[in-house]
């Protein structure tokens, strides 16, 4: 860089008499909106664009500081990349479909869906907000599916406004013209188009199979949505009997499933049961004949070592049933209750009577009946013993999952295809994880998949499958030959739209058609966010240009807890559809913990609403707290950190105002006139100023390297550490020289020395405004406006490069500033220990330090003497390494060997 290019020209404005962070958010947010500061231009090629796959928050959830935490991490990177010259594509989406939204709408309006009801265009809900109270299903008003969807859309629109207001106040540099809703027309079109292409390639398929089922939400649940929780229960030792009445005992926590038993299973290597393999026993109470079989998945050390296989009690039952080709004997309905009709396989009259007593009962009630009957029959050995077992729950549910057989849609994800599994592992190796140790979580998940991705849900508010089925002459749907629309018709709702070649009168009649009534899992849409925001496969030129310049995307920021759901499913979809990764980098944030180091959650009642700390401390302060946390690690909600962030923002304002006011103040210390300045590195001539610039060059280099590696907290630490040193040491050391103030002997600093200090101050604070801009967008914009009036936003300014500061340093060591700071610290210590004013003169002093320290201090002796008010003799004593060691003092320390204080200044009387 030439000398001319290194010069920073400043247009200085009048300065406010008082500075503070209050009011900055509203002031600058309005300017950013008016100027389109964060708008994506899309005028350049892919290499000049940085695109972010922003997480669309679930708007049905309540706002909490966890949102502020992770989204700040993303915004720091977005702002940094924009300052690096990239055209940043930073959209925002709203995840507004799925079960959480439905549950919120049910409670908010007091309604539930009854698909048999017609649409009522004049419907008014019985409630308009219930203060978070849950309304029992029996008290909810039944409405049509269409009425329910309208209420979902109405409430999510309200919720989205709250989220947007928070994001804007926090200062997220989002392009608000680039927003989407996962239930909107465009995302629906993308999701349906991708599904139809998956179907055409054989990657999507439907199957009647046993699957996990949530009895509360009445829907199938995918493996990725499971949550293993400890659940209390009882072990029951139950006798099955051979033909001659000899018992063989199993232990079960689910005796209510005895009627669904198909076999007894033991490990083939279990010597206790080898003799029985191939023999038959009869189930207690129901007298159903079942075989004793071998399977390697049977655990010899669990319970009695032999277990009953029912259809279905858990996923192990499914494995045994599939591997051993056992009969299907389901007795649990989708509502979680025992079937009403006694099954045909129970032939014993007494057994049929027992079953009739359990018909229609919940599993809990049925269990009690069966246990009582087992006691009466003598088939219960001893009393049930308490136990706690890990049980599968739907992550949003509060009852254990059942396994029921139903027709569902699946998407291949490597769970049943070894080749695809290996390909997805390789995709994970291509992806840059930040932090890198998160990669193993992805790989463990992919390796552990035991089935394809179940993508259908038996709910209402979501993206419909774009399918119909022919209805045969007997009125049965032909699920093997789905009717699909052409892509140009998308999006469609098959419950409203009619397939080509049919008319509405043929709906649900023999020889006509019927709609697919299931909807897609919300993750089936969210997994396509890169394709949604980049307008994949849209026919218009603008969309094609957008896709070309933004896909594959650069960054996916997200929480560590949804690697298995969102991150993996997005990789799967891009691999199947685009034959590439959806993005190059993934950043993973940790969780927010409360002050007791417990994860914040609504159920625990320890959630903090984010508006509170923003109102109290300011957006910059809250952003500072969030940005100080390292990726991948949990962080504590810490108002102490926010106070530090607020203090940092205020210090930036005060330090910048102080430096810019030098030489411009009137007698009342008011700066009312504009001015121009040229901060030329060649004008930095004094050793201390050069040392400050040398350290600044190091900081710029380290901060840049950290942000390039997505280590935002490391960059902040480096910048902040030097900022405080710059303010506390450097400014204090040079302020007298910068003002041209004579020393204690009346010596006036030269114009060259004055200019050197003022130039270094200008270069330094200009750099800090830009270095801190990604973290403190409001305070930095304010000080930038004082320095560079009319030049636009600091957030569109160039990120600092080392060249001007290297040029200004001209080979100086940054350690000179460190030594000078330590020397001043010792001079202050003399006065603080004597309990006198810092304005008290020092008549004489002798400081000792290592030889390199003495040289550094000597180079800045004039500034140090003025800062410490040394008016007399100032001696420096060089200590050798062995002396420091003998005195147990670090070689980097400065010590006072002797000093003499003058008289403290007389306090002026208060008027």
Curated annotation (Swiss-Prot):
One of its GO terms (biological process) is valyl-tRNA aminoacylation. Pfam families: Anticodon_1, tRNA-synt_1. One of its GO terms (cellular component) is cytosol. Signal peptide: none annotated. The keyword Aminoacyl-tRNA synthetase applies. Its main location: cytoplasm. One of its GO terms (molecular function) is valine-tRNA ligase activity. Its EC number is 6.1.1.9. A motif ('KMSKS' region) lies at residues 599-603. InterPro entries: aa-tRNA-synth_I_CS, aa-tRNA-synth_Ia, Anticodon_Ia_Val, M/V/L/I-tRNA-synth_anticd-bd, Rossmann-like_a/b/a_fold, tRNAsynth_Ia_anticodon-bd, Val/Leu/Ile-tRNA-synth_edit, Valine-tRNA_ligase_type_2. A motif ('HIGH' region) lies at residues 57-67. Keywords: Aminoacyl-tRNA synthetase, ATP-binding, Cytoplasm, Ligase, Nucleotide-binding, Protein biosynthesis. It is an enzyme of class 6 (ligase). ValRS has two distinct active sites: one for aminoacylation and one for editing. The misactivated threonine is translocated from the active site to the editing site. HAMAP family: Val_tRNA_synth_type2. Monomer. This is Valine--tRNA ligase. It comes from Bifidobacterium longum subsp. infantis (strain ATCC 15697 / DSM 20088 / JCM 1222 / NCTC 11817 / S12). The gene is valS.
